[in-house]
Amino acid sequence: MKTLFIGGIKSGKSRLAEAYILEQAATDKPYYLATNEVFDDEMQARIRVHQQRREDLFVTIEEPVKLFETLQKCRGPVLVECVSMWLNNQLYYQIPEADILQELGAVLQLTCDMVLVHNEVGLSVIADNRLARQFVDLSGKAAQLMGQHCEQVFFCSAGLKIKMK
């Protein structure tokens, strides 16, 4: 089963997704695919919070770019934290949008149980630069693709989740 947790920054989506997959996995230790790359001290601090929270509850894999290739190797439930940062990394490495969406589509066809975390950035103001607008547009397309393929979708805000699908 594929499940999407989508919400704004600091909405609680990561914590809710982690609790959800741990509950669903029951006896299996789920994989935690961390897609973030460290570019500054502030991002390192955010990553540290996530690492401390998950402790040894997950088998952690850090891979910022090769999502499909990495997920093919997982033999159990997996949490992808987060699709938004993976999209950011793809744009940083100048991967064409069509290739990015094709890879995400392939990920969604994998048969493993998967929980995807994604930032809802389309509710914000229109960005003032081309790259930021490109990211927001790509993020929206990715969210629609995940929404279509996931059996469950939760919108997160204020530390709460609302089932959308």
Predicted regions and their residues:
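Residue-level signal for inorganic ion chemistry
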Residues: A17, H50, L79, N119, ...
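Conserved P-loop
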Residues: K2-Q72
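Residues at the starts of beta-strands that form the adenosine-phosphate
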Residues: D28-Y31, G76, D113, Q152
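Short, flexible active-site-adjacent loop segments at beta-strand->alpha-helix junctions, enriched
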Residues: N36, P64, V83-S84, E120-V121, ...
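Short, hinge-like loop/turn segments at secondary-structure boundaries
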Residues: R48-Q51, V78, A132-Q134
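Structural beta-sheet core signal
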Residues: Y32-A34, V80, L116, F155
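Helix-adjacent hinge/juxtasegments
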Residues: R54-I100
